[in-house]
Amino acid sequence: MLSKKIILILFVFCLSCTSETSSTKLIGKFNIEKDLYLAQFDCKTDTDDIHSIAGIATMLSDSRFLNVKYHAVAGTYGIQDGLYVPANELFEIAFGTHWSDAHSNFEQALSEVTKLVIKTLKEGGNIWIAEAGQSDFSASIIKNIKNTFPSINTKFQIHIVQHSNWNENNTATDNLTYVKENADYIKIPDGNVVGNGSPGFYTEDKVNWRNYITDSKLINVWEKAFEIANEYNGKDGRHNNPAIANGGMDFSDVSETCWIFGFNYLKNAVQFFEEFSSLNN
């Protein structure tokens, strides 16, 4: 039999482990106290990014995300052809001052984001990138980090989540290879499909989102998203998204953000709105 002294030591050890775990404030894999979340949108040429911006703004408005540090980036496209979908007004409504415009000024956006990333990494935090597009911008971030602070282990501290084969195929080959070698690159199932292990946020059916979203800011965000997506969907050779053309929704890129924050159990668009309904806050 174990002596009382050994039992006491084991009890104190277990208690200390429990206290350490419970003191770490996590949402899914994200440490609220240290980490930085980056939402990067190519916005070229599919208008699904526009719906995805509204979807991510909806998640960030939830009370559970109150202290999440985040930054969004517009125009993180790769080598694909086609026209850009301008959505600056939507970015401003959705993210306030927490976004950069890589389409208008790539170097300025890269500088702004690099500063945020370096600050987080130096303080021991991780970077979680939801890649709603290609990975060329992410490659530039990592190269900046390695040039400035080569001692930082980007493979351990920078996580890139990608759901789309198309996005990978339209990333410059050398940049895709680079991020896979120098970051924790995570490929999840396609967010356009229901029942494959990722939430399926593509639907050609209309979703009664107003039954769930009553917050005035979010109503404004979604209305602006629909306005922009409807204006540019298929316009001047841009991709014609069938879901958006039929009055449905496509915020499939949000599947990556759900994976990061532990909501990848959601099945479809309706379950998304049930989970993040304004009525729950």
Regions found by a protein language model. Name each.
Residues S22-N281:
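N-terminal acidic, glycine/proline-rich low-complexity segments
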Residues K5-C14:
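Sec-dependent N-terminal signal peptides
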Residues M1-L2:
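N-terminal secretory signal peptides that target proteins for export/translocation
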